[in-house]
């Protein structure tokens, strides 16, 4: 082999070895939190539901968990904790046109942790270094908790500007156990990563507050439950790109599908359909018919569970109607490829499955 070619070959080989040794950010979902689960809540804003109190309950539950919402992966120096994931959407007269409000996301959490481990910690941080990095970000005086206290409180949510948030984050990180010694560029990037989450969190909460607390209550035929399920199916399709993806769908509604787009006769008007069903089997077939006509089918690549809060209820629901309503939705869920269970409390829905 000529000397020039040999020298070029050796240079390429050395460069390849060096590049291979550079730590890479673990950007793929389900790497740092392999059993994480995406959660989406649907709140019915019709007169039959109390969406204001439902959102207050869900909001309070989320605020109580915010300090530990970023969780912790299984790494030396850390106590593993599952992160919080929460999106919220509305059931109204045309639910399928409503986009979910993503308040806090597993993907955002994993991106921040990947940055902390790979960029700040150098790829394989020691146990002591990992503990210090954790304290700088999520400890009692860490940057994440300080920004939470400044911008997100029980009743008041402030959406900070990028420059304002990053300035506060920079001042905090300069006092850190480890972050005070990193390069200015890494500290600057850290402020951007943390503030992106804080801004998304505050923006999501403000949007949800506007939708469920101050927004007008829907009157008339405005429980497009099937449209909400279509939105959930679209979320599942997006998740199917990720290996081992999980999704929990929590629906707070009386589950009496009714919207301006449907007639009062036929299977789509749930209340009339079950009242006109002689048997439980007939009610189940009505639910299957709606599922078939809706064109909804959930991806088998995603592990999905459905939890319903408040199905039926009210003075008009005797035991026979309740059984027929259960049969109706049992037929529907089976036809779209899912099973469901009923929950008594919204704040307990979709809990315990993200382990």
Set out the residue ranges of the language-model regions.
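Acidic, polar low-complexity linker/tail segments
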Residues: 21-56, 109, 117, 353-355
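…and closely analogous acidic/polar surface helices at protein-protein or active-site interfaces
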Residues: 47-85, 105, 111-116, 121, ...
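Acidic/histidine-rich, surface-exposed loop or edge segments in extracytoplasmic proteins
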Residues: 35-52, 205-216, 307-312
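Acidic helix-start/capping segments at beta-turn-to-alpha-helix junctions
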Residues: 78-110, 351-354
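Von Willebrand factor
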Residues: 120-244, 257
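DG-centered beta-turn motif at the end of beta-strands
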Residues: 42-46, 247-258
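Bacterial N-terminal signal peptides
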Residues: 11-20
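VWA/integrin I-like adhesion module and closely mimicked acidic/polar interface patches used
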Residues: 53, 256-321
């Amino acid at each position: 082999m000529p000397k020039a070619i040999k020298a070029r070959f050796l240079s390429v080989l050395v460069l390849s070895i060096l590049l291979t040794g550079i730590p890479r950010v673990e950007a793929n979902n389900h790497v740092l939190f392999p059993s994480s689960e995406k959660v989406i809540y649907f709140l019915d804003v019709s007169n039959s539901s109390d969406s204001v109190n439902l959102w207050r309950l869900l909001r309070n539950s989320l605020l109580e968990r915010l300090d530990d919402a970023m969780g912790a992966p299984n790494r030396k120096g850390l106590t593993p904790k599952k992160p919080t994931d929460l999106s919220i959407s509305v059931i109204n007269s045309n639910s399928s046109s409503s986009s979910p409000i993503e308040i806090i996301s597993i993907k955002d959490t994993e991106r921040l942790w990947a940055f902390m481990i790979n960029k700040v910690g150098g790829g394989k941080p020691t146990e002591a270094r990992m503990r210090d990095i954790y304290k700088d970000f999520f400890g009692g005086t860490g940057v994440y908790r300080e920004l939470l206290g400044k911008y997100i409180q029980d009743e008041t949510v402030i959406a900070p500007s990028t420059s304002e948030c990053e300035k506060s984050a920079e001042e905090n990180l300069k006092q850190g156990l480890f972050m005070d010694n990193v390069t200015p560029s890494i500290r600057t990037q850290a402020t951007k990563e943390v503030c992106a989450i804080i801004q998304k969190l505050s923006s999501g909460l403000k949007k949800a507050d506007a939708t469920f607390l101050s927004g007008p209550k829907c009157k008339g035929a405005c429980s497009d439950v099937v449209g909400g399920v279509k939105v959930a199916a679209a979320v599942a399709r997006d998740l199917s790109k990720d290996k081992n993806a999980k999704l929990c769908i929590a629906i707070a509604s009386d589950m009496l599908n009714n919207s301006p787009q449907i007639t009062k006769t036929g299977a789509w008007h749930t209340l009339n359909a079950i009242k006109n069903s002689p048997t439980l089997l007939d009610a189940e077939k009505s639910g299957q018919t709606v599922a078939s006509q809706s064109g909804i089918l959930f991806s088998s690549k995603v592990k999905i569970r459905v939890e319903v809060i408040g199905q039926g209820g009210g003075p008009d629901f005797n035991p026979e109607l309740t059984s027929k309503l259960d049969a109706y939705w049992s037929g529907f869920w089976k036809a779209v490829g899912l099973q469901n269970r009923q929950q008594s409390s919204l704040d307990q829905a979709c809990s315990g499955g993200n382990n």
